[in-house]
Design a protein with these regions (language model features):
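Bacterial Sec-dependent N-terminal signal peptides
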Residues: 1, 5, 16-42
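Substrate-binding surface in catalytic domains of secreted glycosidases
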Residues: 46, 78-88, 130, 150-280
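Glycan-binding loop/region signatures in secreted carbohydrate-active enzymes
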Residues: 65, 246-317, 338-348
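Sec-exported extracytoplasmic/periplasmic mature domains
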Residues: 71-74, 98-99, 133-141, 169-174, ...
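Active-site and adjacent substrate-binding regions of carbohydrate-active enzymes
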Residues: 137, 147-174, 178-180, 306-348
Length: 348
């Protein structure tokens, strides 16, 4: 073999060795971060469960009727951190929801001032979101619900709310893992609160729990706080006027009644309490008594016929219903949640 050929073979071996070393030393590329919502849940039946209720007083069937349970609340503190109300109740509700195949969310609330201060800076939002996501992972939740009541256009919180929701959405939607929802007003009244909800948010939030109730008056009598007309107004404003995707519209239904033309202090009653005072499940008003008023008064609520109509409206013009709150309902044939589920064909 000639010396030239030997040199060529030697060079070939060196080349192969170097090439092999390079392949072994290459660091695989980092997978791209995917920001995308989790799979859609279809028609939502959302029920809030406040921290001050006893989980044992609400039967399992009420959790089977809902496919999402919002625990109320995780609070933003004056220092901008997260504080979850009543951890023992929280963990009991988590267990009860999961045992009955319902998703469990943490609903975030607090004073407007505390939200405003926390959301005012990048650092404040980043710190709060980090605590929220740590709680979501620690308690193995399925998502979060934002219940800031309410950002406004006249103090700059419309912009900081939008920034907060964008950043929280990105954290929840990282690798399509967690849901994010938000509570908004019925949309009836133009102004600094309604207008603070920017259309941009439709891209960040998986659905909106529209609070189509509490349209009361302390001076005008005979005014229903949550009639069917208000539900229609909510649908028309959010989905038609504003262009919210109907797949993201969830209609709120109250399981309680309010008077009109008198004080709301100690006069608001649960649906169950109204029926206990001989109110009818087939009516939307009743004469009741309560400690906040010296004489019997008229209270306005949603009976089963109205709830059925609202459920059908939500099915045709939206994508879900929400109830505040589970404990207010009865747990028998007169149940409002049962009437809604039976109307939309939800099995439980």
């Amino acid at each position: 073999m000639s010396r030239t050929v030997q040199k060529l073979i030697s060079l070939l071996w060196v080349s192969l060795i170097v090439s092999g070393c390079k392949k072994n030393d290459v660091t695989p590329p980092t997978p791209p971060v995917v920001i995308s919502p989790p799979p859609d849940l279809g028609f939502k039946v959302v029920g809030y469960f406040p921290y001050y209720r006893d989980p044992a007083t609400v039967p399992d069937v009420k959790f089977r009727m809902t496919n999402v349970v919002n625990y109320a609340f995780g609070i933003v503190t004056p220092s901008g951190s997260l504080s979850i109300n009543s951890i023992p109740v929280f963990t009991a509700i988590i267990a009860k929801a999961k045992a009955n195949n319902a998703k469990i969310f943490l609903s975030l609330s607090g004073s407007h001032t505390d939200f405003k201060n926390m959301a005012a800076t990048d650092a404040g939002r980043r710190s709060f979101i980090k605590e929220v996501m740590n709680a979501v992972r620690s308690y193995q939740l399925h998502g979060v619900d934002m219940d800031w009541e309410f950002p406004r256009t006249d103090d700059g919180t419309d912009a900081t709310y939008t920034a907060l929701m964008k950043e929280l959405s990105d954290s929840c939607h990282r690798d399509a893992k967690y849901y994010i929802t938000a509570a908004v007003t019925a949309g009836k009244y133009a102004g600094v609160i309604r207008d603070a909800i920017k259309n941009e948010l439709f891209n960040y939030v998986d659905w909106f729990n529209v609070m189509s109730y509490d349209d009361f008056s302390t001076t005008t009598p005979y005014r229903h706080h949550s009639d069917y007309t208000l539900a229609q107004v909510s649908v028309n404003y959010w989905t038609t006027t504003r262009g919210m995707p109907k797949t993201k519209f969830v209609l709120g239904i109250p399981a309680y009644g309010r008077p009109s033309g008198i004080t709301q202090t100690n006069t608001v009653l649960s649906y169950a309490a109204i029926l206990a005072q001989s109110g009818s499940s087939q009516s939307d008003s009743a004469i009741v008594t309560a400690g906040g008023h010296p004489s019997p008064y008229m209270i306005y609520y949603n009976g089963q016929p109205t709830v059925k109509k609202k459920a059908m409206l939500a099915k045709t013009a939206g994508n879900g219903i929400m109830m505040w709150e589970k404990w207010h309902d009865t747990h028998d044939a007169a149940s409002l949640l049962k009437a809604a589920c039976d109307t939309i064909g939800r099995t439980y």
